[in-house]
Amino acid sequence: MTKEQILAEHIIDAVGGIDNMDNIINCMTRVRIKVLDEDKIDYEQLKSIKGVMGVVKDDRVQVVVGPGTVNKVASHMSELSGAPLGETIKHKSKDYRANAEAQAQANKSEFQSKQKRGKFNKLLKTIANIFIPLIPAFIGAGLIGGIAAVLSNLLAAGQISGEWVTQLVTVFNVIKDGMLAYLAIFTGINAAKEFGATPGLGGVIGGTTLLTGLTDKNMITNIFTGEPLQPGQGGIIGVIFAVWLLSIIEKRLHKIVPNSIDIIVTPTITLFIIGLLTIFIFMPLAGFVSDGLVTVINGIIDIGGVFSGFIIGAFFLPLVMLGLHHMFTPIHIEMINQTGATYLLPIAAMAGAGQVGAALALWVRCRKNTTLRDTLKGALPVGFLGIGEPLIYGVTLPLGKPFITACIGGGIGGAVIGGIGHIGATAIGPSGISLLPLISDHMYLGYIAGLLVAYAGGFIFTYFFGTTKAMRESDTLGD
């Protein structure tokens, strides 16, 4: 074992073992441990450990081990505890070494499972882990922006007036832009966490793409086109790739840079290398990719119209079932960044609406099946609000046929949205009725029409073709 690993184990022993630790974090020089019972800490033993420079008693036990060393010690303590830094430790064993072995075995099984699923599914999980924590912010900022847009329209129409209303609109827009304008920074932070890099460095790389402080007189040139590089060019695709590369460089530097200068040298060199690559290489190239992707998808929706809408609406539910729908998250965000709205999301939302229609048909058609109806009582209300997993995994998928007819209903609703055209959403996250406040360009009626048609399509196809005699007459959730 390395001296840092030995130091980590001695610290764990002195603070009362893994069972007495709630979580672990670290700063530049200290490992900060939140303990469950302070009486179990042997402070004299802790201070006498070789490598411990000092101990500070606070709301956390702060063990000073020095710059550079602290990252390695905290990391090994995290591995032994079985919990990532900052997260609550699950106490499975009184012997932390046995706990570590059990965690290692669990990690091995998880790794083997990932290998079986393939790299593509691992990529989807990574995308989900980066963006799912941001969804509440998207929803909140999007709804506040929607309220600001409604108030602005009412002001322009003369239906309301007053300086306070104008100020309120300004404040709401500032709150909305607090999320959308700095999305690259949030993405960089979350990507760094996912890739095992320092979150702050990921945020800096995200902020670098905003080209803060540049004016028309001191623009940076795109080396591929000769034109000025635009703030945010390359979007989140470029940020994610840059932070992934940053994580590789930072980890390697931690291994080779001496502990005494690690805290200074590693972040400086990492940002220097990745910052230059981001500005001159990643932003221009990712800009080509993201611009092309958004153009192609919008073109497919515009040109395909009804047909494209049906295909997206019909096949989105199986993508959700397989977890593949997460691959659309960066696409939605890029569409919002470039055009102000994602025209893909309202069509995809029809998949959930078709499932709601199918569930309503099952409620009517299978009156004798009390088990099914009890399940629907809990799953159907949230289905209207766009939370479809209870219906997918609790009702339609186990029954088989209703899942297929729900997909058909979603396809019909998607065809309506595609046929009407230009129905977009200004933020991601909600679906179903919950998406209504986020619909752009006053296309609310078009979206409602799509929902109603999807409900009806799912209901009709399920009522006539989506049930069996066993479903209708049995008292179990099965066909």
Curated annotation (Swiss-Prot):
Gene Ontology BP annotations: peptidoglycan turnover; phosphoenolpyruvate-dependent sugar phosphotransferase system
Xref: PROSITE patterns: PTS_EIIB_TYPE_1 (PS51098), PTS_EIIB_TYPE_1_CYS (PS01035), PTS_EIIC_TYPE_1 (PS51103)
Enzyme Commission numbers on file: 2.7.1.-
SUPFAM superfamilies listed in its UniProt record: Glucose permease domain IIB (SSF55604)
Keyword Transmembrane belongs to the record: yes
Location of the PTS EIIC type-1 domain: 125-479
Active site: 27
Functional description taken from the UniProt entry: The phosphoenolpyruvate-dependent sugar phosphotransferase system (sugar PTS), a major carbohydrate active transport system, catalyzes the phosphorylation of incoming sugar substrates concomitantly with their translocation across the cell membrane. This system is involved in the uptake and phosphorylation of MurNAc-GlcNAc, the principle peptidoglycan turnover product of S.aureus, yielding cytoplasmic MurNAc 6P-GlcNAc.
Protein name (Swiss-Prot/TrEMBL): PTS system MurNAc-GlcNAc-specific EIIBC component
Organism this protein belongs to: Staphylococcus saprophyticus subsp. saprophyticus (strain ATCC 15305 / DSM 20229 / NCIMB 8711 / NCTC 7292 / S-41)
